[in-house]
Amino acid sequence: MKKKYKTKFPMARIKKIMQKDEEVGKIASATPILISQCLELFMADLVMKTCKITQAKKGKVISVNHLKECIKQESTFDFLTEIVDRIPDDKNEKRGRPKKTEGEDGGEEEEEEEEEMDMGEEEEEEEDEDDDDSDEEEEEAPKKGGKGSRGGKGSRGGRGGARGGASTRKVKSETSPVLKNTTITTTTATTTPTPTPTPNFANSPKDIQSTSLKKPSARKSNTTSPKSSPFLSSSAGSIQSPPLNNNNNNNNNNNNNNNNNGNFNNNNNFNNNNNNFNNNNNFNNNNFNNNNNNNNFNNNSNNNNNNFNNNNFNNNNYNSNEDENNNNNNNNNNKNNNNNNNSNNSNNNNRGQQFLSSSTASTITLPSNQYQPLAPISLPVLNNSNNNNSSNNNNNNNNNNNNNNNNNNEHILGNLNNNNSNRKINTNFDEEDSNHNINKSNINSIMNSSNNSIDNKDNGFNSFTFSNNNSNFNDNNNYNPNNPNNNNDNNGNGIVLPSLSSTNSSSTLPSFSSVPPILNTNNSNSNNSISHILNNLNSKKPNVEDEDFD
């Protein structure tokens, strides 16, 4: 309302006049605005009628006489007759403000109206104005005194607040600007010695607060976190550097120090006794430990999942695990010395051997974060000709499982491990194709019942020859990384590893497609048929007496 209807009449004055009557209570804020608008309309009507009288008399300035005549002529202005009679004529004494000869007519008319209103109630208005001014100053005084801008100490209405309020009241009550300046200077002069008063309990908490506010910097220095040092922690984490040397992990099936990056270690030798061949795959005459598929190639151990056992043969117990784990286990009970393969699986004739414990040839994937010298390796499993093999002890691959507790004279096509005898197998692999598939393999099982051993010269388990970079894996304790093209003889001079400069994310290792010629799945030649191999084995039958097996 105030912004929309701007008036020149003071709202406080109108409100004060309205509240002179005792019956009038509170007044709404819109009421003085409406009254000011009524006053404007009334003044405009009065001026227009007075202007007509002035024009009739051929005058240019509206005078008091013109107003008197207008009020006397118009019946609507009868309530103003008493006021007009008190106003003297222009020729007589002039009371009130002097007239302005210059300016617009509207400005002169407003001045005349104000004179007209003030003349009738001069005495009462002067008293009312004094009262209004004092009230307004009292309302503004506590606001300014509370801030303590002129009173001194205490922004919350303390000791200096009352002084400041009193000083501001004195300043406003006095009208001369010179006195205002003097009072300001006197108050400031009186408040200057107040900052160091006598010790009081009221002032002590403020002093304590002032001292306590000086210590946030020390607290911030304590709470700030220390700078992260690259030596203390690393966002990328610790770098896993594989151990380059794994010296003689004796008969360890778990191999916590395996080279997980696919590196063949210098001291991880392919021995007949204790040394582990690491890449998460222990390829020993003692342990062939595949940690990914739990397929163990063991000559001495019967306690691994999915054992790749060349007839685990002990002094007291012969554990063949026949017909316990999988419907597709081969119950090869051989009572003859010819090592006949009596298979109960109809899929064993042409499909050959399934590798590892899966429906197809499983692969062992190596970590691809740092080094990729080696790739997935496919390992042979003897006499397991069906698929859908899981890693939960489903494949117990035993060749020629004999059910005899007296094991001294049994002839098994595989690794015989009697704790009191030395039995070895010669497995010669010839490489022909670039796919690392060994298509020709001969196992000459010449067995002697007197010493329970196989001739080591012709049938020694000497070497696995990979076609990857002409590297040979031998059973001796030497490793020559500087001679990748070393072709070893039957005795073997060391393990020559594939080059580590492979940049492929998944390089491939050669896969053993077959260990005995019976199990070759990649070659459909009639030379590799079961009957042909059995005939060859019959022709090379050792001179051992037949025994009856229970």
UniProtKB/Swiss-Prot annotation:
Record field: compositional bias (Polar residues): 200-224
Compositionally biased residues, Low complexity: 182-193, 225-238, 245-350, 382-422
Biased composition (Basic and acidic residues): 89-103
Pfam families on file: CBFD_NFYB_HMF
GO terms assigned for molecular function: core promoter sequence-specific DNA binding; protein heterodimerization activity; RNA polymerase II general transcription initiation factor activity
One GO BP annotation of this record: transcription by RNA polymerase II
Coiled coil stretches, renumbered: none
GO CC annotation terms, alphabetical: negative cofactor 2 complex; nucleus
Chain intervals with Gly residues compositional bias: 148-164
Subcellular location: Nucleus
Record key words, sorted: DNA-binding, Nucleus, Repressor, Transcription, Transcription regulation
Main location: nucleus
InterPro entries: CBFA_NFYB_domain, Histone-fold, Transcr_DNA_Rep_Reg
Region described as Disordered: 89-355, 378-444, 461-512
Domain Histone-fold, residue spans: 7-71
Biased composition (Acidic residues): 104-140
CDD domains: HFD_DRAP1
Family indicated by similarity: Belongs to the NC2 alpha/DRAP1 family.
Protein role: Involved in transcriptional regulation. Component of the NC2 complex which represses RNA polymerase II transcription through binding to tbp and thereby inhibiting the assembly of the preinitiation complex.
Protein's recorded name: Dr1-associated corepressor homolog
Organism per entry: Dictyostelium discoideum
